[in-house]
A protein has these predicted regions:
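General beta-strand structural signal in soluble alpha/beta enzymes
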Residues: 1-2, 18-22, 43-47, 112-114
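Rossmann-fold NAD(P)-binding glycine/threonine-rich loop
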Residues: 1-16, 23-24, 34
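Residue-identity detector for threonine
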Residues: 2, 50, 60-63, 116, ...
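Short gly/pro/ser/thr-enriched loop/turn and capping motifs at secondary-structure boundaries
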Residues: 2-8, 25-29, 50-54, 120
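Generic structural signal for short, flexible, solvent-exposed coil/loop and linker residues
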Residues: 7, 18, 32, 156-158, ...
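Short alpha-helix boundary/capping motifs
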Residues: 14, 39, 64, 127-132
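Conserved anion/nucleotide-ligand pocket segment
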Residues: 17-19, 28-106
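C-terminal catalytic/substrate-binding lobe primarily of soluble NAD(P)-dependent oxidoreductases
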Residues: 67-68, 72-204
Length: 204
């Protein structure tokens, strides 16, 4: 992300293609952002889902498997999972790095006080991931945020986006608002904001 312009110029000089690692969440978020921008939408918020709880920030590679409901044998021996890697997924480190990459690549802002990981299901994304002055949770239009698949009681929320990515877009005029409604898109109460999400991702 930090050297993207240089890599793109280098690829052009050598008549080759430079692309992102499609498959993982940051690149899939960028794909959605670019689609929205090419179609004339402003991107209000973009990000991904994950399983997050504030208590997980104290997790270590030695305690990580209990949070996943797995035994060490099942995770490490049978599936070959790396406890350090999977702890970074849980404690928020990887989410922070990935949202930094998306922010750098897209010019979307980071939240003013860091990621908040609100528990939000897919049918509430367009209602909640909009600016606070519009009744939502985010600081301003045009930022990144990660949503949690569990609530503060560590219970699964309905229709979570644990493995996926999303964007929130804004209608620029009444015609587009009408289209949101006419085509059955999920919106906020004003009909101005809608969300697009992808439920899964693969490592890239």
């Amino acid at each position: 992300v930090t050297c993207g312009k240089y890599l793109a110029d280098l690829a052009k000089e050598n008549n080759v293609i430079c692309s992102m690692a499609y498959g993982d969440q940051p690149s899939l978020i960028m794909e959605q952002i670019e689609w929205a921008q090419l179609n004339g939408f402003s991107v209000v918020c973009a990000g991904k889902g994950t399983k997050y709880h504030p208590d997980f920030e104290y997790s270590t590679p030695d305690t990580v498997w209990g949070h996943y409901g797995l035994s060490k044998e099942r995770a490490e021996i049978e599936s070959g999972m790396n406890p350090k890697m999977f702890n970074s997924f849980l404690c928020g480190d990887k989410s922070a790095i990935e949202m930094c990459a998306v922010s750098n690549a897209s010019n979307l802002k980071c939240p003013s006080n860091g990621l908040t990981f609100p528990p939000v299901g897919v049918y509430d994304i367009a209602k909640k991931l909009i600016p606070k002055e519009e009744g939502g949770l985010i600081d301003y239009e045009g930022q990144v945020e990660v949503i949690s698949s569990i609530d503060l009681n560590q219970k699964d929320i309905p229709n979570d986006l644990r493995w996926g990515v999303y964007i929130v877009i804004k209608a620029q005029n009444q015609y587009v608002k009408n289209c949101f409604k006419d085509y059955g898109m999920v919106t906020d109460v004003s009909g101005s904001y809608s969300a697009i999400w992808r439920p899964y991702h693969y490592i890239g």
